[in-house]
């Protein structure tokens, strides 16, 4: 079965999707789901994205089966490294998705994307440099999510992270991930745009050239209409490049 390995329900501060609705939609689409509720320990608003993990498991364990798995999306930051690692180890997740939602102490959506003192190249380089720092430091995740996350929100004329401008640092990131046995996500949110798809093909091809073999697929759905969105285009990329889509169960890779 195909799995959407990046889905948020009402246990994430930015979603009000009910698990029952998510399950119904997944059944309709014939896809499995891994719920990846947000835990962003250093988020600027201390009341948001602080997942109550015991409550999450207490409420959702009854829904867990071969087609519905329980994971978490960890915001990888430096100040709370020890706390985040402890929470990653303490509970029996099926899957841990690692994400970069901030550049050092600046949340990307709230603050970093509003900066007007950086060129396009500087903006993306700083983000990728921080990503390199955290993937080097952290071992407590299985797949790295949406490396193109800031591209959703920036207003540059060329709104893509490209190999042409960032090949050296992307190589470093991919080599670290591969050496640690981590994989990367094809996040499908932006795969409705031909320019984005072509750019993604270049970047994922480089991941493959460096020894990457596997990817996870994630819609980053926060509502039922986005579950498994653009998966057809994602499969086109994996087939073209010879990358193998996988999902995780009990922190172990499984094949579609």
Model-derived segments and their meaning:
Residues 16-17, 125-126, 168, 198, ...:
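Residue-level recognition of alpha-helix initiation/capping sites
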Residues 1-78, 83, 87-94, 153-164, ...:
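An N-terminally biased module of ancient metal coordination in phosphate/nucleic-acid-related enzymes
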